[in-house]
């Protein structure tokens, strides 16, 4: 959704990656999924990186993979600099990303959590809305 929002890509940190494209696990070369699919259908072979021969997979962070260091640093800096930190549609159960709301709160931000279910961070929030996100957004005309 954030790609379709019109926000400049340079302002987006994808802590958990992105399933709309793929990356080489060795050199991080980006590949478009449609091209990989076409190549696979032609050869019936799993794709390998054209640069280094590494394994290519969707650009999401899988269980056991480290969080992307650069994106974590940017996100931590933005949390510290924020005066309002809004968590939308997240269980806040995956660390270290789940620490970001507390980091923002500890440095003076107002913390808002909007999620269909309660989270373990609700107790720290200034405002908690446990409702369907689409209903809330339609009511406030976002």
Label every model-predicted segment.
Residues 1-142:
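Conserved catalytic alpha/beta core of Sir2/sirtuin-type deacylases, generalized to analogous enzyme cores
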């Amino acid at each position: 959704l954030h790609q379709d929002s019109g926000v400049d890509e340079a302002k987006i940190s994808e802590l958990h990656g992105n399933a709309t494209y793929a990356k080489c696990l060795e050199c991080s070369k980006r590949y478009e999924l449609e091209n990989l699919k076409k190549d696979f259908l032609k050869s019936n072979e799993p794709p390998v990186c054209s640069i280094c021969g590494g394994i290519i997979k969707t650009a999401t962070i899988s269980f056991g993979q480290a969080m992307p260091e650069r994106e974590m640093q940017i996100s931590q800096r933005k949390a510290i600099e924020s005066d309002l930190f809004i968590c939308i549609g997240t269980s806040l159960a995956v660390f270290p990303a789940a620490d970001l709301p507390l980091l923002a709160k500890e440095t003076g931000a107002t913390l808002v959590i909007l999620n269909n279910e309660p989270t373990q961070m609700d107790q720290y929030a200034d405002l908690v809305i446990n409702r369907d996100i689409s209903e809330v957004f339609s009511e406030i005309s976002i």
